[in-house]
Amino acid sequence: MAELRPSVAPGPAAPPASGPSAPPAFASLFPPGLHAIYGECRRLYPDQPNPLQVTAIVKYWLGGPDPLDYVSMYRNMGSPSANIPEHWHYISFGLSDLYGDNRVHEFTGTDGPSGFGFELTFRLKRETGESAPPTWPAELMQGLARYVFQSENTFCSGDHVSWHSPLDNSESRIQHMLLTEDPQMQPVRTPFGVVTFLQIVGVCTEELHSAQQWNGQGILELLRTVPIAGGPWLITDMRRGETIFEIDPHLQERVDKGIETDGSNLSGVSAKCAWDDLSRPPEDEEDSRSICLGTQPRRLSGKDTEQIRETLRRGLEINSKPVLPPINSQRQNGLTHDRAPSRKDSLGSDSSTAIIPHELIRTRQLESVHLKFNQESGALIPLCLRGRLLHGRHFTYKSITGDMAITFVSTGVEGAFATEEHPYAAHGPWLQILLTEEFVEKMLEDLEDLTSPEEFKLPKEYSWPEKKLKVSILPDVVFDSPLH
């Protein structure tokens, strides 16, 4: 629960400037992380020392539900001559380490990221006659922050977020988000590490799909060229009724050419998915991955879970060559989730050594597998095949209901434990499937109707007996079962 109020001390927008005129005890009274971010806000808005802000009534570190302590809201006059309209500028406080005393984030030093390493911003076009900023963007930012805190997945520029609902709960076509660097907020170095500022950009469904099929950065560049769709500063207009492709049909050609030339930069998604080892007898429940009702999958230990997460994170990192690194016990920063080139899955900023479970060291070769996806995840299979594997890359589906994962790899990917001789291989609940270019082309032909999901009914099954591979597209309820 949050409240709207003008910011006054000790909120993040009220302290005096640091320097000779600052009170001697100020540094000890005002949290240094807050002070550093406020300094950047004050640089940008020197005439708005006390902006309106949405404040968490019960702070997250006191058991409240909202991870962001504050969201400050500034009035930005834009630049009419540069096609930048007047707008509201929202800035979060809480994804980075504001306090440095481990109440929320573990302090890991001054050289790395502060907390999760970023704060969110959002630019909303100001409507004529609007005297105060709408507060719904603050709740949107809280929702994204909850996702980050709960999943430990971070965001990076070019990432996209599938929201499937108007951002302001209206009838708007703006129902999804891309993320980019804020055009005005500069990274700041705090006593607890570095903080960058990632701006939320509202987009239509068609624009989200293009970002998935190509890459987020490419679509962001197109949005910058269309003033009504964002312009140079990527300002969200919730009243925009047309996609950039309806405004300028030639932009679709640029996307198509980009996909053909570059492939897709989307290397993985969080998804409703599962897999079964069909070469094992059904009564062997120890390693079953079945999601059928009545089957209880084996629960992973905490160490197993962390090891798989780390391996997935490392496997999703973007390298100059497509590489899936071997399982390693060393934790380090990296990236995953519905994302972009440098995927976002920061699963820990500290370095610690974990015991590698025996099951994860041992690779199991499988003779026959059954892949299961919900409709939304299944619709991305052609993207995985055409935009990733045909370009010598890999693509991972990470289950949102557990630690299970499915990684498709091409023959050009190094470090994969699936090989042409044994194309289906598993480390615990992580399955890798190696597909040759010839088989990818065959699958694309057979899966053509996935690009028009409204034309088929669930459940839908595809099978390649000669390859001992089966793919099922299933209703969401199958994955939502508490027994899964």
UniProtKB/Swiss-Prot annotation:
It holds the Pfam family SUFU. One of its GO terms (biological process) is aorta development. Disruption phenotype: Complete embryonic lethality at about 10.5 dpc due to defects in neural tube closure, abnormal somites and abnormal heart looping. Heterozygous mice are born at the expected Mendelian rate and are fertile. After 1.5 years, they develop a skin phenotype characterized by ventral alopecia, increased pigmentation, with papules and nodules on paws and tail. It is found in: Cytoplasm; Nucleus. Residues 336-347 have a biased composition (Basic and acidic residues). Keywords: Acetylation, Cytoplasm, Developmental protein, Isopeptide bond, Nucleus, Phosphoprotein, Ubl conjugation. Residues 12-21 have a biased composition (Pro residues). The modification N6-acetyllysine is found at residue 303. The modification Phosphothreonine is found at residue 353. Widely expressed in adult and fetal tissues. Residues 1-21, 279-360 are annotated as: Disordered. May form homodimers. Interacts with ULK3; inactivating the protein kinase activity of ULK3. Interacts with RAB23. Part of a DNA-bound corepressor complex containing SAP18, GLI1 and SIN3. Part of a complex containing CTNNB1. Binds BTRC, GLI2, GLI3, SAP18 and STK36. Binds both free and DNA-bound GLI1. Interacts with KIF7. Interacts with GLI3FL and this interaction regulates the formation of either repressor or activator forms of GLI3. Its association with GLI3FL is regulated by Hh signaling and dissociation of the SUFU-GLI3 interaction requires the presence of the ciliary motor KIF3A. Belongs to the SUFU family. This is Suppressor of fused homolog. The lineage of its organism: Eukaryota, Metazoa, Chordata, Craniata, Vertebrata.
